[in-house]
Amino acid sequence: MSIRRLACSLLLSSLALPVLAAECPAMLQGELPKLRAKGENIELCQYAGKPLVVVNTASFCGFTPQFKGLEALYQRYKDQELEVLGVPSDDFRQESADSKETATVCYVNYGVTFAMTEPQPVSGANAIPLFKGLAEQSRQPRWNFFKYVVDRQGKVVASFSSLTKPDDPELIAARREGDRLATLIPSRFTALHPSGRWALSVCLPRLARRRTQFTRRALQEQ
């Protein structure tokens, strides 16, 4: 997978105009309890108008080391308004029943600084509204560390399986597809080309031709 492809997706993600706080998309309306924050909640509408990566996480999964890549992604692009939201879940039987242990894994073991919620159901009929909304626009998680790239207008630009790492170029390209910033998402994340210059005349046709192909490959990964 080329870095150019990932960069193109991220660039297009950046093109969406910022959304006013008053224009909170339906999917982002509501709040979720913040992990080990003594009653503090995360207002999802704060993400309106920003590129967002939503990930369902688990503390005892083979993909748990992806926390490191997600944090690196967040640190690299947070100055460009990228947000990452981690939602722990025991839907796949790999999360602790003790949120203190969940917090230790992400905050202490992996140094996570992006927002994390208390464990939530993310699939099936019991999924929280946020994940129902994500699934309606894409598909529901089939395993832990399923990644959704959401643009500034609350639209899912792309989704990536657990196999896609946070530094994957295609994930970063998807982030650009929803925001004008040019470098953001994981799928098998790799660093964006240093020049950061990608013409729309190149990116738009490229994505138009390859999006269907990529979707098919992503489904096959599952």
UniProtKB/Swiss-Prot annotation:
An example of a Gene Ontology cellular component annotation for this protein is:
periplasmic space
- Asked if Signal is a keyword of the record, the answer is yes
Which domain of life does this protein belong to? Bacteria
Query: What gene is behind this protein?
Result: gpwA
Q: Which InterPro entries match?
A: Glutathione_peroxidase (IPR000889), GPX_AS (IPR029759), Thioredoxin-like_sf (IPR036249), Thioredoxin_domain (IPR013766)
The protein depicted here goes by the name Glutathione peroxidase
Q: Which Pfam families match?
A: GSHPx (PF00255)
| E.C. no | 1.11.1.9
Subcellular location(s) per record: Periplasm
Residues the record marks as active site: 61
Look up the signal peptide feature and give its range: 1-22
The catalytic activity, as recorded, is: 2 glutathione + H2O2 = glutathione disulfide + 2 H2O
